[in-house]
Amino acid sequence: VALAIMALMATLGWRVLASMQTAVEINRQHADQVLTLDASLAQWGMDLDAMVELPLTRTLEWDGRALHLTRRSGSTGSDGAIVVAWTRASRNGQFQWLRWQSLPFTSREGWQTAWNEAHNWAQTSQDSTDRREVRLTGLAEWQVFFYRTGAWGNPLSSTGADPAVNNSLPDGIRLVL
């Protein structure tokens, strides 16, 4: 009887250890996901903070699928500027939040090329092998709102808005994931 009780206790002990190991692994995966999302949001903030208005170019555009922006290339901007695009697209059969950035440029022609590349990349729904694409995290859906003239609104909405206001940079950008 004692041997049977000890065998039962040993079996239960191993089950407890296996359950604890599973819990540790689940917590580790969750922590990794949270850290990835935190780093992604930090990059989002850095991109918005580094936006730069260049003559005869667009600084920010939301087309309903991707957010495109022009930003300084480095912390000082002496290396020129880059175009960054953020979008949600299917990669490997799962929707992902993605970021893409152009090579640095210093001319309007370079900006136009980078802007067109960003638009082409964002419209591509199949898996991309572009080295400038970074897959950030799984994302079911996302929404972007601009804060202009004292209210949050859809960036694509132009109802009752002054065209000069719609073409200016918003006072704030809200991201809903």
Which functions belong to the PLM regions below?
Residues 1-45, 49:
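Aliphatic-rich helix starts adjacent to a transmembrane/signal segment
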Residues 48-71:
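Short, glycine/small-hydrophobic-rich surface segments
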Residues 64-154:
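Type IV pilin-like appendage domain
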Residues 152-177:
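Short, surface-exposed polybasic-and-hydrophobic patches located at secondary-structure transitions
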